[in-house]
Design a protein with these regions (language model features):
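Helix-turn-helix
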Residues: 1-25, 29
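Hydrophobic/aromatic residues within well-ordered alpha-helical segments
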Residues: 19, 26, 30, 34, ...
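Hydrophobic alpha-helical connector segments
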Residues: 39-77, 127, 131-133, 142-145
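Secondary-structure edge/capping motif, primarily at the C-terminal ends of alpha-helices
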Residues: 45, 89, 156-159
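Amphipathic alpha-helical segments used for helix-helix packing
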Residues: 60, 73-97
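Short alpha-helical scaffolding segments that buttress acidic/His motifs in well-ordered protein cores
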Residues: 64-68, 82-86, 145, 149-152
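Hydrophobic/aromatic-rich alpha-helical bundle segments in the mid-to-C-terminal region
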Residues: 95-100, 104, 117-181
Length: 181
């Protein structure tokens, strides 16, 4: 980590006395970066217009969900860190709150994606705040999408030889099925 950051080992150890502290800091930073990218997708000027069209709404949902998957080298590196944090939290209870935050972030992304699929721009903010969607069926659909995202997340990391485009295709097919119910 020190070499990658261009710091000496002593400098890193000054700021982070344990590996868990460093892992927790990195996880928080990645979470903030992902939230900023998602806010950029939602805040884009064309989202309001895009949701008016069925195919564009699907594209918005796809872009949101791709943030939770190892679809390129940057996302893969981030997802590997999250997986390490999740695995470590099984032995270190102090890390479990961060894993809970990660779970909430993926659920929030799923809620926003469902809001996009349903073309409900008024629900995007609700989903983004971590609140349940105002419709029970939509909230259940978000829970289902969350499960799909977790499965694709693990497949992408466990089977790195799998083409990221195949992950996208599986995600797109799942989103289309959810939309067309």
């Amino acid at each position: 980590v020190a070499a990658e950051a261009g710091w000496s080992l002593g400098a890193v150890q000054y700021y982070f006395s344990t590996r868990d502290e460093l892992l927790l800091f990195a996880g928080r930073q990645l979470q903030a970066d992902a939230e900023a990218r998602i806010a950029g997708i939602i805040g884009a000027a064309e989202v309001g217009r895009a949701l008016a069209e069925r195919s564009s709404a699907l594209d918005v949902a796809l872009r949101l969900c791709e943030e939770a998957l190892p679809i390129d080298e940057r996302h893969r590196s981030e997802q590997l860190l999250w997986l390490a944090l999740m695995m470590r939290s099984a032995r270190e209870p102090g890390l479990q709150p961060s894993v809970g935050i990660s779970w909430e972030a993926v659920r929030s992304t799923a809620r926003m994606a469902v809001a996009a699929l349903l073309r409900r721009s008024d629900w995007l903010e609700v989903g983004g705040q971590g609140l349940p969607l105002p419709d029970d069926v939509a909230e259940a659909t978000a829970a289902e999408l969350h499960i799909v995202l977790d499965g694709l997340f693990l497949q992408g990391l466990i089977y790195p030889e799998r083409d990221p485009e195949a992950l996208r295709e599986d995600l797109l097919a799942a989103l289309q099925r959810l939309r067309d119910r």
